[in-house]
């Protein structure tokens, strides 16, 4: 069974983008390449259990085992040593990527309190979009009673688009609720 969002991309988004930007080939139409979820756990320096819980939550959200990220260099002000585990990240591609994006757009983002749309200023100039989520509780897989601490996470949507405008139209076509 093909994913609902992937079908929407193939049947609706590709023709709309081709018409708007006058692409000569279907392969020139921008597409979502990967989604990277990153959870920085600063308090993992003092308590390693926090990192394990954060990684478990990230695995629940993404459906994939996260990679533990380590500090690249020592920073005395943060009591940080090089090589200490300080976060977790997951890179989603293919079917899981579309499933996550569909869940994010249709279920998770509407659960955010006082939600008026995601900001349009978060594009990086090369067609990639970054979104910060303040609490992991907006995801349906996270059980409220099992959460020991509210943690945020970064979501980076990497597209093949060359400009921010193309990327914005792609994500809008996929249902991303941008603020007016």
From Swiss-Prot:
One annotated Gene Ontology cellular component of this protein: ribonucleoprotein complex
GO molecular function terms noted in the UniProt entry: rRNA binding; structural constituent of ribosome; tRNA binding
An example Gene Ontology biological process: translation
Regions annotated as coiled coil: none
Keywords: Ribonucleoprotein, Ribosomal protein, RNA-binding, rRNA-binding, tRNA-binding
Any Pfam family hit: Ribosomal_L5_C
Transmembrane domains' residue ranges: none
InterPro entries: Ribosomal_uL5 (IPR002132), Ribosomal_uL5_bac-type (IPR020930), Ribosomal_uL5_C (IPR031309), Ribosomal_uL5_CS (IPR020929), Ribosomal_uL5_dom_sf (IPR022803), Ribosomal_uL5_N (IPR031310)
Role: This is one of the proteins that bind and probably mediate the attachment of the 5S RNA into the large ribosomal subunit, where it forms part of the central protuberance. In the 70S ribosome it contacts protein S13 of the 30S subunit (bridge B1b), connecting the 2 subunits; this bridge is implicated in subunit movement. Contacts the P site tRNA; the 5S rRNA and some of its associated proteins might help stabilize positioning of ribosome-bound tRNAs.
Family: Belongs to the universal ribosomal protein uL5 family.
Assembly: Part of the 50S ribosomal subunit; part of the 5S rRNA/L5/L18/L25 subcomplex. Contacts the 5S rRNA and the P site tRNA. Forms a bridge to the 30S subunit in the 70S ribosome.
Protein known as: Large ribosomal subunit protein uL5
Organism listed in the record: Streptococcus equi subsp. zooepidemicus (strain MGCS10565)
Gene: rplE
